[in-house]
């Protein structure tokens, strides 16, 4: 998808007050700041593109409940996401993320977090603050803390480990 076509898609979604937008598998390298104009969005799926960063304007998507960013080119956790307080599900599988920021603790409504297949070695204690978090997928990371035997037990065991630290 060209930048011009992407801008047209965003403009059409804004005009029609779309609540859901799927732009996966489009070789998108950059998300334009205009994405922040889609203030009615509740579900945004950008999986399988070529994004390396997220524009700060993403913070304007105050109603966003689900964000799919699987299989991008992120080498860091896009901190801008941590201002999306209504976010319930976050998918960042298959990137090159090495660290989850402490600001993840701001996502109080998060129920599911998929971080499989990244390069994360430690999970932040702030994950323990996420009382609604039920599904935490972290396998396929070179985790040191929590240790591999905990990770192999699944979401509930990982969450219990983090919450009792």
State the predicted function of each range.
Residues 88-102, 111-112:
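A contiguous binding-surface segment within folded domains or other stable secondary-structure elements
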Residues 1-68, 75-89, 102, 125, ...:
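The feature captures the LRR N-terminal capping module
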Residues 112-118, 126-128, 139:
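Gly/lys/ser-thr-rich phosphate-binding loops in alpha/beta enzymes
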Residues 108:
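A short beta-strand-loop micro-motif that forms or neighbors metal/cofactor-
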């Amino acid at each position: 998808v060209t930048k011009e076509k992407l801008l047209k898609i965003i403009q059409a979604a804004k005009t029609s007050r779309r609540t859901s937008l799927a732009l996966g598998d489009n070789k998108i390298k950059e998300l334009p700041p205009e994405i922040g104009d889609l203030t009615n969005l509740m579900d945004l799926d950008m999986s399988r593109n070529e994004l390396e960063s997220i524009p700060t304007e993403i913070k304007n998507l105050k109603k966003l409940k689900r964000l799919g960013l699987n299989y991008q080119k992120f080498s860091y956790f896009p901190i801008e996401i941590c201002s999306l307080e209504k976010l319930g599900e976050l998918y960042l599988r298959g990137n090159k993320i090495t660290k989850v920021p402490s600001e993840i603790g701001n996502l109080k409504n998060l129920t599911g977090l998929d971080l499989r297949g990244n390069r994360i070695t430690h999970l932040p204690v702030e994950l323990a603050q996420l009382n609604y978090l039920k599904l935490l997928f972290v396998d396929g990371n070179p985790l040191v803390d929590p240790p591999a035997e905990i990770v192999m037990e699944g979401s509930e065991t990982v969450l219990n480990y983090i919450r009792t630290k």
